[in-house]
Amino acid sequence: MDVLDLLVRNTSEVLTVEGSHRERAEDALTPRPGAVVGVREGRIAYVGPEAGLPTGAVGPGTEVVDAQGGFVGPGFVDPHTHLVFAGERSAEFDLRNQGATYLEIAKAGGGIASTVQATRAASEEELVRLALPRTKRLLEQGVTTAEVKSGYGLDLATELKMLRAVRRLGTLTPLELVPTLLCAHAVPEEYRGKREDYVRLCIEEILPAVAREGLARFCDVFVEDSAFTVDEARRILSAGRALGMVPRLHADQLTVCGASELAAELGAATADHLEQVTDAGLKALADANVTAVLVPTSTLFLRMRPYAPGRRIRDAGLNVALGTNVNPGSAMSENTALALGLACLENGLTAAEAYWGATRGAAMSLGLQQHGRLTVGDAGDLVVFSCASYRHLPYHLGVAHARVVVKAGRIAVRQQMEGCA
């Protein structure tokens, strides 16, 4: 073995997360008590007992991280974010707390429309500047990879501007970004009463322009009574797939609308939200091997019920991923630790199932085969936590405990922490 670039030692355990979502989550996390982790050239090079390290693996240039008895796991992967936007909507937050609903605010011209106005007015440079602190907060939570959606442009120029900002942002932060086109987030004000014209704009102009520049890996649609119909979503997502963008769907969040069945029909990568999913929808998703992405922070933020039925989803055999859905309107929070806690308290998952969802489950949803686990050859993305067990993360609600965050073998975050209680 060549000399390691980085070695993490003195761990309580290392979670390599080598298992499958079809087995018991506690087993799928594959804990290695007292193991060390070695990284070389941005990849995992060794996981095992320290005594098993080959002679010469640790040299003068090896950075040695003392885990101080904390556990080590893969970097978190956030499969659902809206990191790039301008403006803020704290006034709407206050209105909701006085009884206004999300749909009432949207119909009055607030909601997504207000963020669209601010994002259209911002330059690409300003969008990058505004998003950089959000990436830092995600990194401090232990997130090393995040999906990022557009969707606050709703016109050709601004959707391109947002995705170019995502690309630029990825050169300025250690956080790895996976771009998704969400031009079908809402029908913009100027197309009110002309929704078919907007659907055609998405299909005939926005999608081809994004594909020409290679700006998005995925294409998403918000399928809902207040957004896009199943038929409209089918047309947009099929057009995106023809251009190389894999479908993702905002599905069955506010009403039962057939979005889960559509995700299954299209063989989508994910169906996200699923607060209103039916048993028939779950069966369709399971049969089509679609990942369910839970975003409980938004359910909390909107003061809605029910939460997505995580227990039923998991028991139906679906791979479950867990995201923050950080966005200015329905989940202004980069707190992965809070999402883990809510997944247990409100979605009905065990601590192991929630941890799987934030690591390997999320990586699978993005098609990232070498992320979200720690086996030799995988991405050198890992987190050294200040607590001895992953079970402490959802229990200590909203507290990250990410003491050292490593991205591609380099330390991206180092935070002073003593103990975990």
Curated annotation (Swiss-Prot):
Residues the record lists as binding Fe(3+): 80, 82, 250
Domain of life: Bacteria
Positions contributing to 4-imidazolone-5-propanoate binding: 89, 152, 185, 253, 330
Cofactors demanded by this protein: Zn(2+); Fe(3+)
Record's subcellular location: Cytoplasm
CDD domains in the record: Imidazolone-5PH (cd01296)
Protein family: Belongs to the metallo-dependent hydrolases superfamily. HutI family.
A GO cellular component annotation in the UniProt record: cytoplasm
EC category name: hydrolase
Functional description taken from the UniProt entry: Catalyzes the hydrolytic cleavage of the carbon-nitrogen bond in imidazolone-5-propanoate to yield N-formimidoyl-L-glutamate. It is the third step in the universal histidine degradation pathway.
Keywords assigned by UniProt, alphabetized: Cytoplasm, Histidine metabolism, Hydrolase, Iron, Metal-binding, Zinc
Reactions the enzyme catalyzes: 4-imidazolone-5-propanoate + H2O = N-formimidoyl-L-glutamate
Pathways involved: Amino-acid degradation; L-histidine degradation into L-glutamate; N-formimidoyl-L-glutamate from L-histidine: step 3/3
Binding-site residues, Zn(2+): 80, 82, 250
Name this protein carries in UniProt: Imidazolonepropionase
Cofactor, how bound (note): Binds 1 zinc or iron ion per subunit.
A GO MF label: zinc ion binding
